[in-house]
């Protein structure tokens, strides 16, 4: 428990958007930012358990900050932060795929969105205990290295078949359009169209 508290306090000492906002609140209210952060986390947890739109809030938490950090990583000259956020997005995509197929079952568990949010926060935490890096190195990378040759071969075959299919469909559509245009094009006549005669009464 002390290790978790020390990590929490180290996080509060870092410079980022959240800690700057907590620092401003601390200056206004006189309440220490660790208590403010703990209160905000407790409210967030309660809302994820009982609030309306917990799914949306959980997805926003799992997407907004990582997207912001990814753009900053792209713009920075360092490659290390790029690797961290690419790894996060690989884990996020894999988690989304698993969740898509298991959502009908997991949706009924009352703590599902709180657990999902905790998992996503674990995956984006900075430092050596980053969940995305742990999952990548212990689960995803070994599976990828074991099966990537077969996956590359299957992807190559599928892309070749898709290109052949697209070329065949394009050829058939162009031929159908050419035949249709030949049928629709009227024969040219030298006589002008007859004028309409009105019957005066």
Curated annotation (Swiss-Prot):
Keywords: Cytoplasmic vesicle, Endoplasmic reticulum, Membrane, Transmembrane, Transmembrane helix. It holds the Pfam family TB2_DP1_HVA22. The keyword Transmembrane applies. The chain crosses the membrane at residues 36-56, 89-109, 117-137. One of its GO terms (cellular component) is endoplasmic reticulum membrane. It is a multi-pass membrane protein. InterPro entries: TB2_DP1_HVA22 (IPR004345). Interacts with STX3. Interacts with clathrin. Belongs to the DP1 family. Required for correct function and survival of retinal photoreceptors. Required for retinal development. In rod photoreceptors, facilitates stability and/or trafficking of guanylate cyclases and is required to maintain endoplasmic reticulum and mitochondrial homeostasis. May play a role in clathrin-coated intracellular vesicle trafficking of proteins from the endoplasmic reticulum to the retinal rod plasma membrane. This is Receptor expression-enhancing protein 6. It comes from Mus musculus (Mouse). The gene is Reep6.
